Amino acid sequence: MPKLEVCCYSAECAIEAEQAGADRIELCCAPKEGGLTPSFGTLRAVRDRVALPVHPIIRPRGGDFCYSAAEFEVMLNDVAQVRDMGFPGLVIGLLDADGHVSLARMRRIMHLAGTMDVTFHRAFDMCLNPYQALRQLTDLGVARILSSGQQQSAEAGLALLRELTELSRGPIIMAGACVRLTNLHKFVQSGIQELHSSAGQFFPSGMRYRKAGVSMSADSEADEFSRYRVDSEMVANMKHALTVLPVATRPA
């Protein structure tokens, strides 16, 4: 049966996702940045309260995946921290300036991670040659690749996801980006083994008093009175659907 990984942006979300039936959690913060490295406090709270496999993301900033030497040093420290805290896996991705997998840096990451399960995230969707990247990540020993098939949504990139799944002799190809209950069947019928979804939405903040004309964001139009959280019912419905959908056989 295909597995459902839920992207969680807080300890509260991780607890809700586990209770709703998720198979694994990708732990992040900053949903509007696409997911950044969670704080130590969040890591510790989730480690202590969630029994599911939790894979924190290692991403020091938003934007592209070509990092400075100082940023890479931060990432190495974060990898060591999540490893030493006992997390079974992590999520990371590094490219060079020309859009190739940053091999030298990824080798250092893999060595530092040791026996941890390493997922190469959607930096894969920004690389120049996905076939070359698949070969390189296979050689590195990466456990899985999170991808939308190099399109804005995984459904739009389904043809490439299917092809990569057939080609891969190592990493699991995990579909992510706009994966929802309404399109789960398309991925399952294509032989995709793992699915990644935020399975949530923005809800109004609990603040009653809302100061007008002052923003904590560089974007003065940003809505700072909403919070993203996992929708437990959505997770449960997606998980149930995966138990009843017919599964395609992966080619040998």
UniProtKB/Swiss-Prot annotation:
One of its GO terms (cellular component) is cytoplasm. Its main location: cytoplasm. Pfam families: CutC. InterPro entries: CutC-like, CutC-like_dom_sf. The keyword Iron does not apply. It is found in: Cytoplasm. The keyword Disulfide bond does not apply. One of its GO terms (molecular function) is copper ion binding. Keywords: Cytoplasm. SUPFAM superfamilies: CutC-like. Belongs to the CutC family. This is PF03932 family protein CutC. It comes from Sodalis glossinidius (strain morsitans). The lineage of its organism: Bacteria, Pseudomonadati, Pseudomonadota, Gammaproteobacteria, Enterobacterales. The gene is cutC.
